[in-house]
Amino acid sequence: NYLILGLGDVYLTAPCAVPVDPRHRLLSSKYNPARTFTAEGTVGIGGMYMCIYGMDSPGGYQLIGRTLPIWNKFKKNKQFGDKQWFLQFFDQIKYFEVSEEELNQWRADFENGRAEIKIEETEFDYADYVQFLDDEAESIAEFKVKQQQAFTTEVDRWKEEFAAQPEEQI
């Protein structure tokens, strides 16, 4: 589950979210230079943050998937209510795998106001979350060490590749 901590990270109330469980937090760099095109509904990771691109736009996050639109440009989807954006601060997002054909059908249904998005009311209990973090502190710390080692190894590899490039390619 991803917890939305901010909106508008890229454009159009794009969520800035992190996995609730710290052991599920990926750490990645952003592209440099950024892409000139990223399709609307693309899911990306930059640093430890997940974002959904609300419109076709440039982008620098590492791409990990596609999802339904988060921006209701034609105001056809009743689950948005009277807003053009779907997500709110502290909402949680949970993804599930579908085929490309299923995703295309969901997206077409969404565009035409027929998609029914599964929404569950839940409460984020901060005291329970702190207890979870305390209970899992050792495994979380072990994960963070491995995560940082992997990231450092990757950055070092990029530096070596960059240094090995002929000057005219830099």
Where would I find each of the regions flagged by the language model?
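Glycine-rich active-site loops that engage anionic ligands at enzyme catalytic sites
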Residues: 1-170
